[in-house]
Structures are given as C-alpha cells and as structure tokens.
C-alpha cells in the first residue's frame, strides 16, 4: 500500500527519484498515466494489469467508456526504475500535469500520484476545508 507525502525534485533529465518506501513495490516495473485533477497516476505493473482488466469489462457500445479508455491508455508509459530508484517522466505527461522541477508525490493506496507542488498545495487547501465534514457522507461506517 502506498502512503504518505514526499517532495522530491525532477532532475535535469526529467527523472524522479521514487520515495524509498515505494521502491520495492515498483522495482519490477510501473506504469505512469494521466490521472484526474491533472496529476500523474503511477501503478505497479501488477496493479495496472488489474485496472486494465476492469476496463476491458466496460461496454464498447458506451462512447464515454471508449473515450475514457483511449485517453487513459494513450497517455500510459511503462517504465522500469534504475538501480537508484529513478524513473523518467515522459514529456507528454510532464506537460499534462504541469510539472517543472518541484513535485509532490503522494501515496494513494493502490497507486502513487505525482503532482506539481503548487497545484497539490492548492488542491489540498481546497479539500481540507471540507475534509472533516465529509467522512460519513463519502465513506459511511468507516470511522
């Protein structure tokens, strides 16, 4: 499970050093793709296979499903981290997420998300205001 918030920087070759706690699960390979709210989703190769299998069950007769799957998969890039735990973030994904050098990497359970740090801080400030009031509405019975 991926947890926590980290603030690495992209190097001059657009490589991201993965947080040490994430490296073991991602060492065999990972997939980066477009995420919601203009972030990049990072899945382990195994988890991405599971996500893809769920997508395959979507009805091809649904234009909305086809459109989503096209955008999601066409932006995907499979990568293998190097021995130092670095992974290159492809230019189209950097552009999509507005990444420069300062990034925020968050653990989101089954995936990692890479955010432009300023965008993450803005998003978090907007969401924290309502956070304590929404737990029962969004996740009934969890807390």
Curated annotation (Swiss-Prot):
**Pfam families the record matches:** MraZ
Q: Which GO terms describe its biological process?
A: negative regulation of DNA-templated transcription initiation
- What is the superkingdom listed in this entry's lineage? Bacteria
Subcellular location per the Swiss-Prot or TrEMBL entry: Cytoplasm, Nucleoid
Give any Gene Ontology cellular component. cytoplasm
Check the record and name the InterPro entries matching this protein.
MraZ, MraZ_C, MraZ_dom, MraZ_N, MraZ_sf, SpoVT-AbrB_dom, SpoVT-AbrB_sf
Boundaries of every SpoVT-AbrB domain copy: 5-47, 76-119
**CDD domains per the UniProt record, alphabetical:** MraZ_C, MraZ_N
GO MF annotations, alphabetized: DNA-binding transcription factor activity; transcription cis-regulatory region binding
Instruction: Give the keywords, sorted.
Output: Cytoplasm, DNA-binding, Repeat, Transcription, Transcription regulation
Assembly with partners or alone: Forms oligomers.
Name recorded for this polypeptide: Transcriptional regulator MraZ
For this protein's source organism, the top of the classification is:
Bacteria, Bacillati, Actinomycetota, Actinomycetes, Micrococcales
What gene makes this protein?
A: mraZ
């Amino acid at each position: 499970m991926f947890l926590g918030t980290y603030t690495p920087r992209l190097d001059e070759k657009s490589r991201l050093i993965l947080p040490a706690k994430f490296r073991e699960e991602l060492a065999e390979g990972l997939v980066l793709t477009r995420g919601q709210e203009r972030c990049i989703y990072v899945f382990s190769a195994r988890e991405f296979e599971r996500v893809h299998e769920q997508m395959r069950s979507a009805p091809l007769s649904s234009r909305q499903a086809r459109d989503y799957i096209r955008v999601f998969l066409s932006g995907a890039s499979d990568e293998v981290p190097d021995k130092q735990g670095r992974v290159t973030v492809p230019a189209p994904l950097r552009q999509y997420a507005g990444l420069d050098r300062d990034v925020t990497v968050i653990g989101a359970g089954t995936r990692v998300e890479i955010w432009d740090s300023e965008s993450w801080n803005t998003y978090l400030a907007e969401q924290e205001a309502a956070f304590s009031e929404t737990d029962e509405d969004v996740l009934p019975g969890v807390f």
